[in-house]
Amino acid sequence: MILLCVISRTVLLNIRKRDIRFFTYFEFLLIAALHYGILILFLPVTALLLRTKEQSWYTIFQAVTEPVVLSAYKVTFLTAALAAVINAFLGLILAWILVRYRFPGKNFLDAAVDLPFALPTSVGGLTLMTVYSDKGWMGPICSWLGIKIAFSRLGVLIAMMFVSLPFIVRTIQPVLQSMEEETEEAAWCIGASPWTTFWNVLFPPMISPLLTGTALGFSRAIGEYGSIVLVASNIPMKDLVVSVLIFQRLEQYDYKGATAIASVVLLVSFAILLIINYIYLKRKSLTR
């Protein structure tokens, strides 16, 4: 509450210093929006960290360094990173196709990209199970090829790719749409090949949004629960991820352990987002 009061007073002073004629209702709406953002975003995070701080450092260290927990961290972060890298490549190609080409069903495909946003995660998991389980559409074919997707780490990877793909596509699409075709034509006129034009002219402006989308997709994959709990076997030391482990600890009434594990994930995700934002702002300042 003290933070809210300080921010509100600072905003009011800044507004009145700039223009005394600002309407009172504008000040009210601005302060209300700030309060809303703080209450929705910062208050739950602060509460989680403070609840973790109530425990001793030794208890926290014990909770987050159990072999099962370390294995869950490893599976979660490595699989989410792999999903983010694959989606960065495939999402870039998909965004390029949606922007640069016209074909039957393009609007349907463009709308389908947002499907993971609209679907409940449990429905997404059930959809993946319908396709990749042993009795699904692709399951028997994959089993015949010796590939097991459902109830394996590969299933976790596909679920993470499914929920995080829209972040890549939707962050790159506006950049591609804003690029003028005359720039490419000028590069071709001076003898540049299509591949050289892509790497030297088109790709540099896409680096920042690509990194941003990849980071958002990575963070989204880390927090995925609904689809993974259906696709994976959730066996410790095999394909158990952190989000499912936290829920299991809550079912066992181990609230302190669940809080400690969740705090580590929160801090790691926040640190990654800060690093990506720093890189984005650094590149933006250099291009000015």
From Swiss-Prot:
One of its GO terms (cellular component) is chloroplast membrane. Residues 73-276 form the ABC transmembrane type-1 domain. PROSITE patterns: ABC_TM1. The keyword Chloroplast applies. It comes from the Eukaryota. The chain crosses the membrane at residues 28-48, 77-97, 111-131, 149-169, 198-218, 227-247, 261-281. GO terms for molecular function: ABC-type sulfate transporter activity. It is found in: Plastid, Chloroplast membrane. CDD domains: TM_PBP2 (cd06261). It is a multi-pass membrane protein. Keywords: Chloroplast, Membrane, Plastid, Sulfate transport, Transmembrane, Transmembrane helix, Transport. Belongs to the binding-protein-dependent transport system permease family. CysTW subfamily. Part of the ABC transporter complex cysAWTP (TC 3.A.1.6.1) involved in sulfate/thiosulfate import. Probably responsible for the translocation of the substrate across the membrane. This is Probable sulfate transport system permease protein cysT. The lineage of its organism: Eukaryota, Viridiplantae, Streptophyta, Zygnematophyceae, Zygnematophycidae. The gene is cysT.
